[in-house]
């Protein structure tokens, strides 16, 4: 690569703070595509910490198979692609159509050892090429901010997995490079508008400055209310009834008993109409506040959710990488009228904490997380913190742990994600064989479910959650949920667990449309 000739210019403006990010998102973004809301909250206190919104995007980056499509959404984005074309290695084919660029990456040999596979040219390099074009001399936070999703099916590019059909338009990954960010710090009660200028074009700089002023003015206005859409018939359907799902669980248990795998996480899908996803997200956030909450508005789909589980988190300064395995689930203790019974709730928690099956399953997945990190972390740097604690949500409680390690030199956050995907709590162990069996029995792509949503930056930081407790919407909402199966699982309990996990999202959609 040649020396970086391009500088990123950051334009920042303070703006009035407002405590309701969902209302702000509705007010500023309405139904525009390539917009994204990412939120974090403190689990136990249920307090909002930070909300990041992509208000305007410069480029939409998506991938299917070994192709990456880069679509400019402004002159700012077009300038990046003009520079990018000059930086693409000859091993990668490049096509242009209507200002879009399509990159064709060589297919990865599946029989390569893990290290060679990790360093092979891959679709992840599309992001690295863009980052290498620019200098961020002042090390401004979020100067290049990529927000979006990695689908579960992205792993097919790297592993020998069955080819499946899917009815969803969800790409293997879909990310937006932010042009205009809004960052809300709920602890300090501050609001910052940040624009990233990737060009020296004077007219584009003028437009972006005017856009920043326009957003500030809008934030001084009374925020628009989220429109209500009423539905009289809101039937819940599924791709598997209880008997069918239970039958798959029993078949997989036989394979566990034969020693083919130790654990596996089959899932099923629930469907219901959802004409107003943002209203449903608002209800979900209120009823089930979670460490990670997200609302992604794409031209092909809307994705929203409240996930309890971090996928992968990486801090470039410390080079610390974190996994947060969740395994072990119980419903909250409630009376017949739905109120929380604290005594019953504590007894359920005690039973879960001391249940041999749940503890064995949880520790198996903690060990899998340790193994995932072993490939990419410095020897001796891995450790487990917060072993087997309990996080509680509106409908369920979970056993959780945190596994931490220090990333090896020469690797970045995208190497780490590629090595660890998909997370063991959504696949099983051994991971690749579990994913093969999931494909065989589920018979269709998972799409966004079980992948990850979040962001990474040019400075190397990455923060993602597993895409669970979520709804993927193309007019109809698809809510997918699974259960971790081990040799002594009780199929009826696991069938109920899959519905319990989906219930918070189902209820939010129903309550938003009554």
From Swiss-Prot:
The UniProt entry, under InterPro entries, shows: ADC_synthase, Anth_synth_I-like, Anth_synth_I_N, Anth_synth_I_TrpE, Chorismate_C
Q: How is its activity regulated?
A: Feedback inhibited by tryptophan.
Cystine bridges: none
Read off the PANTHER family from this record: AMINOBENZOATE/ANTHRANILATE SYNTHASE, ANTHRANILATE SYNTHASE COMPONENT 1
Q: How does it assemble?
A: Heterotetramer consisting of two non-identical subunits: a beta subunit (TrpG) and a large alpha subunit (TrpE).
Q: Which family does it belong to?
A: Belongs to the anthranilate synthase component I family.
Q: What does this protein do?
A: Part of a heterotetrameric complex that catalyzes the two-step biosynthesis of anthranilate, an intermediate in the biosynthesis of L-tryptophan. In the first step, the glutamine-binding beta subunit (TrpG) of anthranilate synthase (AS) provides the glutamine amidotransferase activity which generates ammonia as a substrate that, along with chorismate, is used in the second step, catalyzed by the large alpha subunit of AS (TrpE) to produce anthranilate. In the absence of TrpG, TrpE can synthesize anthranilate directly from chorismate and high concentrations of ammonia.
- Protein's recorded name: Anthranilate synthase component 1
